[in-house]
């Protein structure tokens, strides 16, 4: 049996050859890139890559080595594509990103729309983000808010996108895909839920509770302590409070903010009833113009990928290769295709940065229905 050091020396020798061959292969890759640049061919040629993978794996008999050979060449070809994307950027041939840099968000004579009624958490987020909210109004649904932007009836819309306890607001993720609107900002506000009843009502009177589904989820433990209460979903916490006020029934209560108690003159029957004392909701500010600020530091994108082994891994490799920090990944089912998903990713960066351009170009070439949701 050979000594361990002797075996390691042989491995080092083989590794040296591998590195030399890798450098030679990448040099040939650059020639391929030059050819594709001159002919206008796309960098990613899925059929050619699959043909190549079938060929190299057929050279190996051992099942374990066959799988390893495929992974090795998948990675080699991935590195080859990334180098080609770099060359495109260096020569200024890369397709421009359809976003315009702005020194500041337009904030004069702006119209802002939010979903709900006066006192809604969306209204609070709007008031914290914008200096002037005198020309603001509310609509019934989040879709109505996005539609107002699309029709030019509003300049900005405020939408909840995620709660720290209940998770994402899935409907609004879908609306960001459906509408050609753009995220230009975000606002995080603390959520402090109260149980509100009509004047003179007591906790012992309550039989029915109204609120938004997310608010009901966020107060799950509290509601479990009152299992005899009927829970009813409403489009908005402030709408629920308004209903309780208008109905004027002692048996009804709403889960909403302290502000809505003041607005609709309701009694606070209990307070701080959310499960998480640090409960927060993130809202996004959406507009119809594809703009981003010079100091914007977060990018949101979405895309679809084939339902194949390793397809998500290959998309994420663009962030690793370009040294970009990914903050979040979510998936949403594609309604028309069972068990297939659209992925949403947030990562740090600015659309002016070359690393960001390289990563986005690669993902756009290799994924389906790629979309930049905003840089903010």
Set out the residue ranges of the language-model regions.
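Domain-level signature for soluble enzymes in the chorismate/prephenate branch of the shikimate pathway
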Residues: 1-376
């Amino acid at each position: 049996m050979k000594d361990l050091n002797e075996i390691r020396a042989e491995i080092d020798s083989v590794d040296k050859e591998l590195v030399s061959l890798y450098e030679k292969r990448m040099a040939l890759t650059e020639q391929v890139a030059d050819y594709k640049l001159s002919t206008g061919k796309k960098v990613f040629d899925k059929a050619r890559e699959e043909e190549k993978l079938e060929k190299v794996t057929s050279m190996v008999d051992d099942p374990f080595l066959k799988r390893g050979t495929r992974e090795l060449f998948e990675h080699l070809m991935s590195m080859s594509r990334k180098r080609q994307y770099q060359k495109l950027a260096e020569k200024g041939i890369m397709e421009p990103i359809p976003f315009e840099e702005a020194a500041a968000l337009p904030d004069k004579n702006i119209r802002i729309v939010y979903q709900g009624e006066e006192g809604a958490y969306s209204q609070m987020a709007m008031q914290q983000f914008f200096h002037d909210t005198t020309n603001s109004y509310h609509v019934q649904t989040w879709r109505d808010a996005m539609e107002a932007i699309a029709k030019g009836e509003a300049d900005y819309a405020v939408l909840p996108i995620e709660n720290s306890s209940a998770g994402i607001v899935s409907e609004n993720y879908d609306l960001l895909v459906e509408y050609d609107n753009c995220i230009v900002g975000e606002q995080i506000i603390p959520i402090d839920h109260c149980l509100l009843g009509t004047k003179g009502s007591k906790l012992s009177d309550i039989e029915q509770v109204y609120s938004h589904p997310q608010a009901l989820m966020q107060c799950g433990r509290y509601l479990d302590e009152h299992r005899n209460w009927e829970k009813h979903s409403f489009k908005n916490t402030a709408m629920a409070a308004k209903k309780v006020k208008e109905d004027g029934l002692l048996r009804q209560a709403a889960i909403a903010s302290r502000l809505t108690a003041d607005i609709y003159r309701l009694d606070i029957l209990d307070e701080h009833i959310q499960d998480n004392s640090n409960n927060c909701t993130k809202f996004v500010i959406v507009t119809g113009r594809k703009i981003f600020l010079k100091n914007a530091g977060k990018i949101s994108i979405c895309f679809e990928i084939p339902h194949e082994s390793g397809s998500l891994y290959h998309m994420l490799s663009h962030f690793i290769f370009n040294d970009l920090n990914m903050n979040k990944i979510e998936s949403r089912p594609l309604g028309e295709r069972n068990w297939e998903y659209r992925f949403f990713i947030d990562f740090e960066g600015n659309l002016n940065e070359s690393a960001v351009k390289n990563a986005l170009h690669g993902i756009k070439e290799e994924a389906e229905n790629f979309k930049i949701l905003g840089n903010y």
